[in-house]
Amino acid sequence: MPKILIVTGDGGEAYEALYAVHRFQEEGWEPVVAAPSSRRLHLVMHDFQPGWDTYIERRGYGLEADIAFDQVRVEDYEAVLLLGGRAPEYLRNNDPLLETLRAFDRAGKWIFAICHGLQLLASAGVIRGKTVTCYEHVRKDVETVGATYVVKDAVRDGRFVSAPTWVQHPAFYREIFRCLSGA
């Protein structure tokens, strides 16, 4: 059974995390949730409300992290998925995680990112020259490191696939599974 590494942490987007785990299980993949340490994570739910300039946040569900970043062996996985929410705000300072992302890139493996997950790719320095999409308030993060931001439901550039938010899950996961099937 192929394995995918799913990266999140406390403050990660609950809907993105639970959907990812279940979606990969449905397709016969083994999802492995990675975080700074293997323990129960505290996820949050984000929503978009009329009249607000940004999203609102509520307490979400919990999710068990299967493995700590410093225990990840890139060769055990076919791909990595970086989730959004607030977790990337602090995870982008985690050196073992950033080195793991660079190793996925060097190995030519698939790298998928949604929402604020693009902050991790920006910090790892692996999206220079790439065309990506992300949550609109992450735009400057990706442009500052030399990526091109576009407004689309899902963007594939080489081995990278990105999407803005959980609202774009249908397009994002269609593209992910198209890539993983070799299409």
What are these regions (language model features)?
Residues M1-A107, I111, L120-T131, R139-A183:
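Extended, subdomain-level signal for the structured scaffold at the beginning of enzyme domains
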Residues C115:
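Catalytic nucleophile serine of serine hydrolases
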